[in-house]
Amino acid sequence: MYVIIVGCGRVGSELAKLLSGEGHDVVVIDKTQEAFKRLGDTFNGLTMVGNGFDLALLKQVGIEKADAFCAVTDGDNTNLISAQVAKKIFSVPKVFARV
């Protein structure tokens, strides 16, 4: 599966490591470069600095081919907006939002 995760805090980083470890293609988006330190050295996915509702960034990471999208930042509004964009604009089949 190709999975995009928005938010690299405790939840996002653990989810990214788990999915990457199981062989899934994972992209993690976070607003700070510092957050990616949580992923450790074994994470083999892609990391991008930005926000989860930036249309250009989402296109850049290949949201059109994403099988799943997980918005798990610490901000409910960010998660809901990002999830809406993924579902309504890009028709990602499986969309999850942490609220």
Task: Describe every region a protein language model picked out.
Residues 1-99:
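Cytosolic regulatory regions of ion transport systems
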